[in-house]
Structure formats: structure tokens, C-alpha cells
From Swiss-Prot:
Organism this protein belongs to: Paracoccus denitrificans
Taxonomic lineage from the root: Bacteria, Pseudomonadati, Pseudomonadota, Alphaproteobacteria, Rhodobacterales
Membrane-crossing segments per the record: 4-24, 53-73, 75-95, 127-147, 153-173
Pathway involvement of the protein, from the record: One-carbon metabolism; methylamine degradation
Protein name from the UniProt record: Methylamine utilization protein MauE
Compartments (UniProt record): Cell membrane
InterPro entries named in the record: Methylamine_util_MauE (IPR009908)
Biological role stated in the UniProt entry: May be specifically involved in the processing, transport, and/or maturation of the MADH beta-subunit.
Coiled coil: none
GO cellular component: plasma membrane
Gene: mauE
Keyword rRNA-binding: no
Domain of life (superkingdom): Bacteria
Alphabetical keyword list: Cell membrane, Membrane, Transmembrane, Transmembrane helix
Topology within the bilayer: Multi-pass membrane protein
Length: 186
């Protein structure tokens, strides 16, 4: 394993980043439960009743994963759960890309902007899966973080999340602009 993956500051940065990612996803889904149910149903990988259950339960599971990632005794199982969820999300995205259903919304964040499914989103989820697995495998070998390392990791993880959300918003704006041009026949 790469030595940097067992550095306390790196692990804290990854844990905070993924925790913030999962809490942001959970909160946006909880605020827009019916809309998220429509997104899950529109993926057409589950029966209608299962889509309803997933739309109700998934945000709670995502919030629990977020909490687990920052509570050290729970961080390894939470990271494994995060990796499993991200892999399932990647599979659902890939199924729809393979079906040619790239016009549907990924449902990642309910920020008012639609983000169409694509191979890029599949890749993004696979990279996030790798980060979660890096936490799960690196944490047991890591030494405890000092206060400075923990604080630096916290700031680095929060900064990474802000950059990630900004890129996500820009991607949504770009997709909206492309859809608008297509609708106008340009």
C-alpha cells in the first residue's frame, strides 16, 4: 500500500471529503423526497415499490455513512458501506448509459440542475469507490492523527468538497445550457 494512504492527515482529508459528500447527498434527497423517488424510478432498474423504498431509505443510509466516516471506531465499516453504495450507483449509471438513456438525471444532488448520466459520472463514482476503499484499507495501519494533522485533514477535506460541489454545479449548468441550445435548434 502506498505510504501516503496511511498518513493521518490524508486519511482525515479523505474521510471528511466523503462524509461531506454523503451528508450533502442525503440532505438534498431528504429535502426533495418525491423528486428523488422520480429519479430512482426513472432509472428503471427497480420495481416501483422498491424505488419508493430506496428513495425513502437511501438518504438515511447516506447520512449514517457520513457520521460513521468521522467517528473513528466506525470509519472502516462506514468506508466499506460507502464503497458499496458508490459501486451500486456506478452500476445503475452504467446500465442506463448502455441502454442509451443518457438524457435522464443522475439524481446525485437535488440542486435544481439536471445532470445527465454519462460514462464520466460512472468513472467519477468508481474513483470515489477507490477513495472509500483507500480509507477502509489504510485506516487500520495508520497512526492516530495529532491535533494539527486532524485539523489540516478537516480543512483539506472541506476544501476538496467545495471544489467537488463547484465542479458538479458547473457540470449541471453546462448540461442545462446544452439542453437549452438543443431545444432551440442551434
Amino acid at each position: 500500500m502506498a505510504d501516503f494512504l496511511i498518513q493521518p492527515m490524508v486519511l482525515w482529508a479523505l474521510r471528511i471529503f466523503l462524509a461531506l459528500l454523503f451528508v450533502a447527498a442525503a440532505l438534498s434527497k431528504l429535502r426533495h423526497v418525491e423528486e428523488f423517488y422520480g429519479v430512482v424510478r426513472n432509472f428503471r432498474v427497480l420495481p416501483d415499490l422498491a424505488s419508493r423504498v430506496v428513495a425513502l431509505v437511501l438518504p438515511v443510509v447516506e447520512a449514517a455513512v457520513a457520521v460513521g466516516l468521522v467517528v473513528t471506531p466506525l470509519a472502516v465499516p462506514a468506508a466499506v458501506a460507502a464503497a458499496a453504495l458508490l459501486l451500486v450507483f456506478a452500476a445503475a449509471l452504467a446500465i442506463n448509459v448502455l441502454r442509451g438513456r443518457t438524457q435522464i438525471d443522475c439524481g446525485c444532488f437535488r440542486n435544481g440542475l439536471k445532470q445527465p448520466v454519462s460514462w464520466l459520472l460512472v468513472l467519477r463514482n468508481l474513483v470515489l469507490t477507490a477513495l472509500a476503499l483507500a480509507i477502509a484499507t489504510g485506516l487500520p495501519a495508520a497512526v492516530p492523527a495529532s491535533l494539527t494533522e486532524g485539523a489540516t485533514g478537516l480543512l483539506a477535506g472541506a476544501t476538496a468538497m467545495l471544489i467537488y460541489l463547484s465542479a458538479s454545479l458547473l457540470g449541471g449548468l453546462s448540461a442545462a445550457q446544452t439542453a437549452n441550445k438543443t431545444a432551440k435548434g442551434r
